[in-house]
Amino acid sequence: MNMSNMAIDLVGVRKSFGDKVIVNDLSFSVARGECFGLLGPNGAGKSTIARMLLGMISPDRGKITVLDEPVPSRARAARVRVGVVPQFDNLEPEFTVRENLLVFGRYFGMSARTIEAVVPSLLEFARLESKADVRVSLLSGGMKRRLTLARALINDPHLLVMDEPTTGLDPHARHLIWERLRALLARGKTILLTTHFMEEAERLCDRLCVLESGCKIAEGKPDALIDEHIGCNVIEIYGGDLDQLRELIRPYARHIEVSGETLFCYARCPDEISVHLRGRTDLRVLQRPPNLEDVFLRLTGREMEK
């Protein structure tokens, strides 16, 4: 990639806490205008990477560049062009929606007049116009998350760093956040997104890095990763004797994984397997297209831990 077009560049980054390695020799780049995802279970190192990008903690070794600034040495210069959506809301609960935006803008040295001028458009973006004078403590979880996103845009940042932006939200609120993020990408914003939601990564990310125990185990476009590592239909089988089922369908399967009480069968011709399972009332069988959950299971031998 052309380095002048990079919003983020990590080379050989390592971070340990005591004897525990949290991020291990990690390298990746994020192009300006793209949504790049860090996908992995809790403990994979996603939040630690985000904190290093923001200059909140320093790597033990390696090189980090954010918006052409070396981090952490020039983290402050980079941060004025970065918007941050933390994993947990840190809004002022007794302030109104409008007051939260007004106060946050002052952290960037913005004048009261400038902040007042941008607040209406941020309220409209977050679909909170009718809640402008409502205390944050009275908002729903989805509304608080949209306000946190709007607050991160107060300084019109070039880059958004979002740590698990939809954790704890119901499906409707999650989809509304996704719609707002797609609107930002259409405006040319760059987004770094950490998530353990497979659907979120597939819907939003142009490219992603799959992490396991601080190590990169795969990187690429979501559909390319699915095609490379799975490339066929998936049959989930629950119930029965898994060892017997494995032997029964092995001749017709490209690959078989067992996770918990579920057998995952990857096959180019799933009908051949369905014929041999017909009439098995003790089984629950689901046939579906492959997804990123299958990629993670294929690479690690286990499901994504929420």
UniProtKB/Swiss-Prot annotation:
Pfam families per the UniProt record, alphabetical: ABC_tran (PF00005)
InterPro entries the UniProt entry points to: AAA+_ATPase (IPR003593), ABC_transporter-like_ATP-bd (IPR003439), ABC_transporter-like_CS (IPR017871), ABC_transporter_ATP-binding (IPR050763), ABC_transptNodI (IPR005978), P-loop_NTPase (IPR027417)
Coiled coil: none
GO molecular function per UniProt: ATP binding; ATP hydrolysis activity; transmembrane transporter activity
Keywords from the UniProt entry: ATP-binding, Cell inner membrane, Cell membrane, Membrane, Nodulation, Nucleotide-binding, Translocase, Transport
Binding site for ATP: 40-47
Signal peptide: none
Subcellular location, principal: membrane
UniProt enzyme class: translocase
Compartment(s) where it occurs, according to its Swiss-Prot or TrEMBL record: Cell inner membrane
EC number, as in UniProt: 7.6.2.-
Membrane-topology descriptor: Peripheral membrane protein
Stretches assigned to the ABC transporter domain: 8-238
PROSITE patterns: ABC_TRANSPORTER_1, ABC_TRANSPORTER_2, NODI
Gene Ontology CC: one annotated term: plasma membrane
Ranges annotated as spanning the membrane: none
NCBIfam families: nodI, PRK13536.1, PRK13537.1
UniProt function note: Part of the ABC transporter complex NodIJ involved in the export of the nodulation factors (Nod factors), the bacterial signal molecules that induce symbiosis and subsequent nodulation induction. Nod factors are LCO (lipo-chitin oligosaccharide), a modified beta-1,4-linked N-acetylglucosamine oligosaccharide. This subunit is responsible for energy coupling to the transport system.
Record's subunit section: The complex is composed of two ATP-binding proteins (NodI) and two transmembrane proteins (NodJ).
Family, per entry: Belongs to the ABC transporter superfamily. Lipooligosaccharide exporter (TC 3.A.1.102) family.
This protein's name: Nod factor export ATP-binding protein I
Name of the coding gene: nodI
